[in-house]
Amino acid sequence: MSGSRLEQVEYRPFPNEEGRNSRQVQWEIPTLVKALSLPAGGRILEVGCGRGIALPVLDRLCGPRRLAGLDIDGELLMEAADNLREHGTEAELHRGDVRQMPFADEAFDVIVDFGTLYHIARSQTALDEIARVLAPGGTFVYETKASQFLSHPVRSRGRRLPALADHGLRRRRWAMLWASRTKAQAASSR
């Protein structure tokens, strides 16, 4: 992204990242695709794609006509490129900030976030960008900390869901997919 300054966001890996990646590939993503009826042949963007673990799975299960990953960390994107090659997956990889994405308006039918948004300062700006690049009728799937939600369900819903509405997104449905740490939700653009 020329002309913009990328800020390094604090990243704390999951305590058992290898185990998490295995669960994500074998169970979480397939369950998510089925539960939310993610469309085949669409345009999919993963924000905060990191090492690109989810991209081959999304490619295999959804057969998108466009698949892209965005991450702020160039080193992780190099690992993602290696991972894509190993799996024979074709996807665009972009270095950039979710708060200022290098994509045209309404460029994606599905945007997925497997735990990036809650690490970002000024997440309202990120939601503005997500709403901008999400096509009408598209789906935004994001992961939140379930422990926060379960401790304070009313406060959590009151804080996050109006923020989605402010950005032209409405809650479509949500599903508890991750038993202990996180929760997946989906919002659709109007």
Indicate where each model-derived feature is located.
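A short acidic, Gly/Pro-enriched loop at the edge of an enzyme's catalytic core
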Residues: R99-V110
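A short SAM/SAH-binding and catalytic strip from SAM-dependent methyltransferases
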Residues: V110-R122
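Conserved class I S-adenosyl-L-methionine
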Residues: M1-P39, G41-G50, I53-V57, V141-G168
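A short glycine-rich, Lys/Arg-flanked "PGG" loop and its adjoining helix->strand segment in the class I
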Residues: Q124-P136
